[in-house]
Amino acid sequence: YPGKKYLKYKKIKGISIFNLSQISKIQKCEIKFKKFDFDHELVILYSSGTTGKPKCICHRAGGVLLQHLKEHQLHCEVKPGDNVFYFTTCGWMMWNWLLTFLASKASIVLFDGFPMYKKNDLLFKIAADEKISLFGISAKYIDQLRKLNVKIKSIYKLSKLKIICSTGS
């Protein structure tokens, strides 16, 4: 959970575990880039399965990037320097959508944990503290806040917030 010291991990053969302070001390890291064609395979994502069995769909690098840039810059009006937050896990397709905000020269804010840990409106506190301009969340989270009668506007200054995106049901 946020703010809690990481647990002592058992040593697992072949797995190295580092904390953030250790990573920040690494002096040099050589990254080797490889050039691929526009139509090169990027990722396989699965359909939700709401209309039958889930289907695997191969997405291509260039097409995904162009589609995401269109959605981010035209539909969501994200500009360079904006701060973007989308509550997601790396196993959900929204993770891929979140990462590509970097191509619009926006910063992304990541959160790992239970969104109501010790505070029902924790994610909106993050939005206020980090001056988030695009805030992405699930419909279930919004519904839960409504059921608990949480009044976000009276608690947090969200003057930088331009758009709230919601997914799911």
Where are these regions (language model features)?
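Alpha-helix capping and helix-loop boundary segments enriched in small/acidic/polar residues
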Residues: 32-35, 56-63, 85-89, 114-121, ...
